[in-house]
């Protein structure tokens, strides 16, 4: 069973045009998932231009100082602050978006999405971070993501959803497209957790989608991959294929990538609690199916060269 469609997703985000300069990249290395993590500069630094690199490639290791870092927006990212759903309506906030050092992350740094609630709408903050270029279509989407099975603080039991998904910029688009990884450690909508839902959408309203569920605890780091080529979408977790969709359940227009951490409902009050989701890095290769091994080899090469950001995907 997949989630009910996330309705009333209002957006007020703009596409940023970025200059490009030459950046020499070291050769890719097939070594282990490691690398040096340079500290991000302060929020007052000047935003750097887009480096060049392998064609049709997006990579970000999330080396930013915070949600107000000018390089975050210059690199085409936006932290959501508008209204609407999914989850607890009108609770989207930049407060939960951070980029702390993390010894468990490749390169020693990750993006943290921390949602919090005390069981009331007024005491709830959800977090979502997305690209704004609307230029990602077919190809390979990959991200190293840390899921949480229990809150970082407070009582367990919330129906939290930790997600990675490419999606159309408008829910009402005639060519609506959405491809979901959704982890529900405690279940939701009447289902029992833990569960990882993969969902391919054709239409948002009325909902028209296909899905498959993996019932397994996934606390920790995982490599999530979506390959959308040749009229087929394949979802994989740590190199294992989970689900394939085809026919009308494939991308039909260019999308943005989103990461979000949100609550389905508020099942109880009685004290604050926080839930963490982390993203080590994100990678996209346009129009090509890339294996897990080659994705990791390319990412290792970026880290080895000290390259934290690449975007050579043609603009819309």
Where are these regions (language model features)?
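Short, aromatic/His-centered strand-loop micro-motif at the edge of beta-sheets
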Residues: 198-221
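Secretory targeting and sorting signals
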Residues: 1-34
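Short tryptophan-centered beta-strand motifs in secreted/extracellular beta-sheet-rich domains
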Residues: 62, 141-143, 220-228, 233-235
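Glycan-recognition/cleft segments
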Residues: 162-200
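Short strand-turn-strand beta-turns centered on an Asx-Gly dipeptide
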Residues: 237-239
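Beta-strand-rich interaction surfaces with strong enrichment in secreted/lumenal proteins
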Residues: 126-134, 210-215, 247
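Flexible glycan-contacting loops in extracellular carbohydrate-active proteins
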Residues: 248-277
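Low-complexity, Ser/Thr/Pro/Gly-rich disordered linker/stalk regions
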Residues: 25-157, 162, 280-316
């Amino acid at each position: 069973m997949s989630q009910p469609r996330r309705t009333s997703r209002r957006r007020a985000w703009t596409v940023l045009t970025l200059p490009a300069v030459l950046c020499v990249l070291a050769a890719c290395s097939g070594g282990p998932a490691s690398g040096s993590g340079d500290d991000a500069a302060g929020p007052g630094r000047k935003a750097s231009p887009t480096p060049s690199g392998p064609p049709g490639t997006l990579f970000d290791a999330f080396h930013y100082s915070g949600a107000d870092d000018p390089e975050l927006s210059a690199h085409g990212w936006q932290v959501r602050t508008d209204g609407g759903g999914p989850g607890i309506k009108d609770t989207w906030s930049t407060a939960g978006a951070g980029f702390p050092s993390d010894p468990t992350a490749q390169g020693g740094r990750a993006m943290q999405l921390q949602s919090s609630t005390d069981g009331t709408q007024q005491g709830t903050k959800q977090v979502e971070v997305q690209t704004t270029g609307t230029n990602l279509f077919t190809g390979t989407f990959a991200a190293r993501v840390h899921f949480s099975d229990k809150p970082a603080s407070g009582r367990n039991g919330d129906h939290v959803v930790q997600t990675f998904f490419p999606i159309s910029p408008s829910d009402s688009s005639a060519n609506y497209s959405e491809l979901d990884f959704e982890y529900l450690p405690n279940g939701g909508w009447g289902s029992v957790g833990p569960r990882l839902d993969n969902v391919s959408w054709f239409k948002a309203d009325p909902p028209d989608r296909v899905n498959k569920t993996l019932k397994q605890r996934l606390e920790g780091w995982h490599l999530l991959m979506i390959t959308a080529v040749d009229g087929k979408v394949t979802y994989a977790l740590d190199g294992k294929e989970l689900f394939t969709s085809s026919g009308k359940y494939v991308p039909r227009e260019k999308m943005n990538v989103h990461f979000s951490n949100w609550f389905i409902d508020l099942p109880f009050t009685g004290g604050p609690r926080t839930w963490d989701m982390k993203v080590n890095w994100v990678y996209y290769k346009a129009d090509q199916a890339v294996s897990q091994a080659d994705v990791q080899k390319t990412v290792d090469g970026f880290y080895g060269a000290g390259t934290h950001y690449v975007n050579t995907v043609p603009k819309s």
